[in-house]
Amino acid sequence: MSSEEDQPVKIEIPEPLPSPTPEQRALKRKRAIKQRLWIYGILFTVIYGGVWYQPYEVDWIPRRIPNPNPPVNPDTSRLFAKGTKVLVVTAHPDDSEFFIGGLLSQLAKSGANLHQVICTDGDKGYYFFFTNAAKNRVVRRQEARNAAKAWHAQSLKFLGYPDRFLHANDEVIAKISDEIEQFKPEYILAFDGDYPPRASHQDHRRSGDATKIAAQKTHIAKWLLLFSTIAPNYIVDITNQWEDQKNLLAIHRSQFFGSHLEGVENMVEYSAELDGTRGGFELGEGFRCIQIK
């Protein structure tokens, strides 16, 4: 007798699946293409949206610094004289303290007559994805008032444009021109729109462009001192004003606090060290001076 172990094992071979028809293959290709398009579309939207939303402009081809670029003396005896009228035009509420806090401290102590114009309310701030723009606008305006009071600004004007969308158009130029004509400054401090850092906020560049045009159009101020520039021809020694500048930065509590404040202080100090080296000082602030008349 044969046991069950001796019985042959029957292996069932499944019937081959029918080959897809040309119509089925075409439908499968269409579905795959649609899936890829969805994925590429999402990636493109995220990348393009991020590039569009971020506020910085980058000069992929570096701008050439003027050569020669000799030192310029913007009549410093008059700049630091008591009663000299100085107009400060910035893009955001914290720009003046961040970029030229040392010079402003010196001008305040010398008795200058200071007036400030802020083009946008900085309502997006540094945390624009997670901020309440309306609330931030109120907070940042108050911080700007507190800071301006600390460096003895006689007046402060908000133009009220939205953060990140400033343009050097006729309207902005006209408003800055009005401020120049009313205040009649001898000196105007503004961003350098012609020779900015390679990567810088677009509002900084546009406010600088608009201010330069307004200054040349009105032909009232004698000197235009442009900061945040890669082509400085005048360096202010701010070694003794560093503590003052740190105190000014700390006023903007909504933007600079905790470890972020320390990081911002280090960033500003590093920039001041670079400018100071150009002028032979421990710390400095660089300006590109243009004589208007």
Predicted regions and their residues:
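The feature marks non-catalytic terminal segments
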Residues: 5, 9-25, 29, 40-57, ...
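Short histidine/acidic/glycine/proline-rich micro-motifs that form metal-
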Residues: 123, 131-132, 162-166, 194-202, ...
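Active-site rim/loop-helix segments in enzyme catalytic domains that contact anionic ligands
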Residues: 14-40, 47-183, 213, 217
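Active-site adenylate/phosphate-handling loop in enzymes that bind or generate adenylated species
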Residues: 175-223
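Internal, well-ordered alpha-helical segments in soluble enzyme and binding-protein domains
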Residues: 140, 172, 176, 206-211, ...
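Short beta-strands and strand-loop turn motifs
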Residues: 157-160, 188-193, 226-228
